[in-house]
Amino acid sequence: IPHGGGAVPYHWGRYRGLAQDMKRPPLKELLLNNVFFDTCVYHQPGIELLLKVIPIENILFASEMVGAVRGIDPETGQYFDDTKRYIENAVGLSDTDKKKIYEGNVRKVYPRFGRRRAS
């Protein structure tokens, strides 16, 4: 579960092409059944790219608050590591999609978490 997908969102087309050249199934079939990406990205454009490239079902909420970058962004006046606000401000993200990112997807990845919390 790399932060923001690491370099994956930037190289997604390359990976798709490599899979095709190697006669592998499309990446959505090959990888996205068990590969997930978190939202621990410290700026809105990074989250927007992640949401544009990776299916919502493969994105998990994450925050290091208070974490690696505790300062306040002089451009926004907000803490860099307040990753929830990037999800809240994402363009075109429905309430249903937000719920998947915040809790629904992680319950699919870690089903015991949901059972433990319910008990």
Language model segments and positions:
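H/E-rich (His + Asp/Glu) clusters that bind or coordinate divalent metals
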Residues: 3-119
